[in-house]
Every structure is written in structure tokens, then in C-alpha cells.
Regions:
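Alpha-helical transmembrane segments of multi-pass inner-membrane proteins
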Residues: 28, 79, 121-154, 161-201
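Small-residue-rich segments of transmembrane alpha-helices in multi-pass membrane proteins
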Residues: 73-75, 101-106, 129-133
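Sparse, context-dependent recognition of short Cys/His-centered cofactor- or disulfide-binding micro-motifs
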Residues: 15, 67, 147, 154-157
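Transmembrane signal-anchor hairpin modules in multi-pass inner-membrane enzymes, especially those
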Residues: 1-90, 110, 114, 118-121, ...
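Non-cytosolic membrane-interface motifs at loop->transmembrane helix junctions
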Residues: 90-97, 154-160
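Hydrophobic core segments of transmembrane alpha-helices in multi-pass, intramembrane catalytic enzymes
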Residues: 39-50, 93-107, 141, 148, ...
Length: 201
């Protein structure tokens, strides 16, 4: 308990930019249930906070790494392919919009590594909590035919969960399941190490 409290003390004593970024990132999975428009707005807002942060702190060197260069190269390839697209106008928005994901990946790396990765623990703990609640809700839906809010899938055999009339719960799992599994493995590994040290040292 004291371990988590220390992390949250750092969170609440951080700068406004950090506070907003970590708070939005912590509840990021919830935006999946609010629709694509809200989710994309969230990403753009986080991108702006991140850009302001690195400008204020003059941390431009952070962008000088393999990940940023690789994503930027991929974006340039998309722009080049746009020249040969049959429907250039329709493809233009998606291609230009890809830049928000480049900055989103970079801001995840940036904030995950601040404060000796303490922000990372806050964010991933929140994601894990949300993921568990969503999973328990799906189990409840399997057993009762509706989720805890009373939502029912219009298609028998398909689960809706908190998405109500949109059968896209699989997209949510694809986005978070690997991250959650890696985080759980890290938790169990740290717990195992702690128990070994406690018993033998």
C-alpha cells in the first residue's frame, strides 16, 4: 500500500503537464468505450501536452532515436504511396492523421520512463484495474446474457460488454492484452524475487 501511495504522491506533486498527461493516460482505456471521435481527441490532446512539455524543457534530443526515425520513415512511405492512390482525397486524411500515432508512441515512452518509471506503474496499474473490470463484466454477460449495466448483445453468441450495441470488444483486448500480460509477468517476477530475498537473506 505504501508503495502505491509513494507513486501517487509524486503524481500529485508533479507539474501541470505531467499531471494532465498521466491522468489522461491512466484512464485511456475508458475512451475506447466512448467512440472513435473521443478516442482520437484524447490522443491529439496527449500529443499536444507532450509537444509542449518537450519544448518547455528543451528535450528535443528525446526524439533522436530509432523508434521515432522508424515511425517517421514509415509515415513518409505512406505519403509517397498517396501519390499513386486512386482516391487521393480520401486517403489524405488517414495518411496525415498517422502522425498523431507517431507522437503517441513517443509520449508513452517519454512518460513511462519519467520519475524512475513511477509514472509507468501508475498508468499500468490503472489499465490493469480497468482490464480486470471489463473481463469480469464479460464473464457476467456469459453467465447471465447481459452485462452489469443491463446491455445485451443483439447477436447471439457475441459479447458486447460495455460497448453496448457495438460488437468490438475484441478490439479492446487486442489493444491491451499483451501490455497487461507483460505487466502481470513483471509483477509476479518482482513478487517472486521479493519472497526469495525475504526467505533466504
Amino acid at each position: 500500500m505504501s508503495f502505491l501511495l509513494n507513486h501517487y504522491k509524486i503524481f500529485f506533486s508533479s507539474s501541470l503537464n505531467h499531471f494532465l498527461a498521466i491522468f489522461i493516460l491512466s484512464i485511456y482505456p475508458l475512451f475506447f468505450f466512448m467512440g472513435t471521435g473521443v478516442l482520437n481527441t484524447c490522443i491529439v490532446l496527449l500529443d499536444l501536452i507532450f509537444i509542449i512539455d518537450i519544448i518547455n524543457k528543451k528535450k528535443f534530443s528525446f526524439l533522436k532515436n530509432y523508434t521515432f526515425y522508424s515511425l517517421s520513415l514509415f509515415w513518409l512511405i505512406l505519403l509517397t504511396n498517396l501519390l499513386f492512390s486512386i482516391d487521393q482525397l480520401n486517403s489524405l486524411g488517414r495518411t496525415l492523421g498517422f502522425i498523431r500515432f507517431i507522437f503517441f508512441v513517443m509520449l508513452l515512452i517519454y512518460y513511462f520512463n519519467l520519475e524512475n518509471q513511477k509514472y509507468q506503474k501508475i498508468i499500468l496499474s490503472s489499465w490493469l484495474t480497468i482490464f480486470i473490470i471489463v473481463s469480469l463484466d464479460l464473464i457476467y454477460e456469459i453467465l447471465t446474457g447481459q452485462n452489469i449495466l443491463g446491455y445485451k448483445s443483439y447477436m447471439p453468441g457475441r459479447l458486447a460488454g460495455f460497448f453496448h450495441d457495438e460488437l468490438i470488444i475484441g478490439h479492446f483486448y487486442y489493444a491491451f492484452v499483451l501490455i497487461i500480460l507483460v505487466y502481470l509477468l513483471k509483477i509476479f517476477s518482482n513478487l517472486k524475487t521479493h519472497l526469495i530475498k525475504k526467505n533466504f537473506y
